[in-house]
C-alpha cells in the first residue's frame, strides 16, 4: 500500500496512536504453501466444473419442488452460486441460464421479509441443511448425494413454511 496510508498501522506514526489491524496471513509460509498446493489441485479446472455442475443440479431440483408445490419463489444463479428469490411473479425457468425479471436490478435488489428468511433458515436447519440467507454456494465436494439430500430438505422446508402460514 501507499506509505502515507500504511503509516496509520505503524507502531510509531504521526497520528499519535496505532490503528488496530488484525493482519493477514498472506506472508505466512504455511499459508503460502497451502495456497500453492490448492492452485495445483485446481489448475485443470475440474473442481470448478464439478462445483458448477452441482449448483446447476441443485437449482434445477429446487425449482422442480417450487413448480410442483405451486410456490411463487424461484431459484437461479450462475456457476456455483444458488440464489432463492421469494415472492417471484414471473415465468418459471426453462434452463439454467435463467435470471428473474431479465436481470432487472431494480426488481432483483430488494429486501425479503426478515421473518420469512428466519423461518426459511430454521426450516432448513431442522432438515439438516445449514443455509445462509437467501443464497448458497456449492463446492467440488458436493456429490449427487448431498444435492439430493438438500433438494429433499428444501421440499420439507417448503412444506413446513406452508403449514406455518409463511407461504
Where are the regions that the model predicts?
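Conserved N-terminal phosphate-binding loop of PLP-dependent enzymes in the Aspartate aminotransferase
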Residues: 1-167
